[in-house]
Amino acid sequence: MPTDTFYRLPQQKRDRLLAAIHGELSRVPVTELSVNRIVHEAGISRGSFYQYFRDRDDLVQYLLEYVDSCFHGFITAAAPACGGDPFELLRRFLSSIRAFGDDPVNRAFCTNLLAHLRANGGVQHCRSNAFSPEWIEGMFDRYFDRSRLNLAEPEDFKLMTELMQTVLQGAVAALFMPGADADALERAFDRKLLILQRGMLKKEAQADAC
């Protein structure tokens, strides 16, 4: 976590530092991040940097929290326009991530950050608590109607949202793999959502499965 000193920085100075970090991570992997290059680009001293972050892991954790805050902002802005359809929100979310990654600098940044996460226990191992089950439940009930879901057991809602998250996270990670075919990935993502919406068994087979 960044120190309180970082959060007390004027917004302009904080944005300049974040832009320098973004630029550095778009050029090199996390393991090759240069504090010297970051502070030079941001126009601050090396000592100041370590007043804001303890080490590289601290910096990566902050980047994850920053990304999560951007995701929160997108969800809050997009959800009201989805007509009460949570699957439409996921489609719009992936489209926005794809558009973000169309910029080569953004794409390199995300590719390097995701590669670091995969090498260090995966995304969930490193994430903040920004997308806790409580946050997801509150967000869903604010913008969507839970009564439209086919919930057979009390725990089904949590399991359903976990499935949706898994499909979304897999699609986002795949978008930033070398040689990714974004059109094909988006089509496959849409098909997976349709399968989740309708279920996997034909109606005549559902009775046999119960």
Roles of regions detected by a PLM:
Residues 13, 56, 63-71, 93, ...:
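Hydrophobic/aromatic residues within well-ordered alpha-helical segments
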Residues 16, 27-58, 62:
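Helix-turn-helix
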